[in-house]
């Protein structure tokens, strides 16, 4: 199992980005969370699962849902914790 941490930047709040993220992560069998950051222009995403699924997920994060305008995605790979049983939207 692998863990992807991403900060997605751009017009990603108020455009259903977190819901899109949860839908795609669930479809790919990933666990973790998506959370709006306080600056209003970034979403933090942590996802754990199969590396191939995570790479596909990362490509989806780069495009986002139709109303989003993704400018940049900062990524890092971490040690998976297996602390997540599903994919959630954090508030």
UniProtKB/Swiss-Prot annotation:
Keywords of this entry: Hydrolase
Domain Acylphosphatase-like: 3-91
Catalysed reactions, as listed in the record: an acyl phosphate + H2O = a carboxylate + phosphate + H(+)
Tree of life domain: Bacteria
GO function terms (MF aspect): acylphosphatase activity
Enzyme class, broadest EC rank: hydrolase
EC numbers on record: 3.6.1.7
Family assignment from sequence similarity: Belongs to the acylphosphatase family.
Listed name of the protein: Acylphosphatase
Designated gene of the protein: acyP
